[in-house]
């Protein structure tokens, strides 16, 4: 099919940052393939692409569909955005839940990138990966999500260097607090998680866990709207010399400075104060014998 617009694939385009990005790019002259998991979830101005990044057959079918559409022009952009968020204490996170978040946030992103790289090479296109400031500054009870984002950031850094010789550029977007529908999902998941804590450990974790989640999600609700990230994605796709990493969102530069410059002990103390966490050693008497 002939189309004079540059083509871009956006994964996780049903809601949040992905949906805002798909709409922003469509309004800026891109032909957007919106990766969604259910029919009817794509923004109206985009081409829907059924794409659950954890299902190899859907990834393969999506690549074939895009290839048939773009032809020799290739793919100008890929936005790796699909992801999920959960909050669990490391001691208590179900291993199946941990595996699933890595399947979506890491393995799925690599699978999509591998699938579309031949088309990106054709167009000397760009890959924009949606990460998180949490890849460098993780929160208590945010271990599973932060670990997946740190893994994704590491892979992105290697990928950027590996494909540069092909004319393909790779950019990592690191947002801080962004208000999306995911906030409600994390809160609901946290309420269910407490019910799953073993009774002998619930007394140790429940108060600090629920307090931290409530405070963190309140900060997310006060954060930037998804369109702020979408505009940075657009810039990363079109800038003559894009940065390797963009920081996005309220207080993100302050957080990056804290992560990069303050001693770990002081960072921990700040987080305890902000999130109302117990002091070191304060729960020793409550540890089951």
Regions found by a protein language model. Give the residues of each.
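Conserved glycine-rich cofactor-binding loop
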Residues: 14-15
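The beta1-alpha1 cofactor-binding region of Rossmann-like NAD(H)/NADP(H)-dependent oxidoreductases
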Residues: 51-64, 95
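Conserved NAD(P)H cofactor-binding loop of Rossmann-fold oxidoreductase domains
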Residues: 81-86
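Substrate-binding pocket helix/loop in short-chain dehydrogenase/reductase
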Residues: 89-90, 97-99, 124
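Active-site helix of classical SDR
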Residues: 113, 148-151
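Residue(s) in the substrate-gating loop at a strand-loop-helix junction
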Residues: 132
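C-terminal beta-strand-loop-alpha-helix "lid" module of Rossmann-like NAD(P)-dependent dehydrogenases
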Residues: 165-219
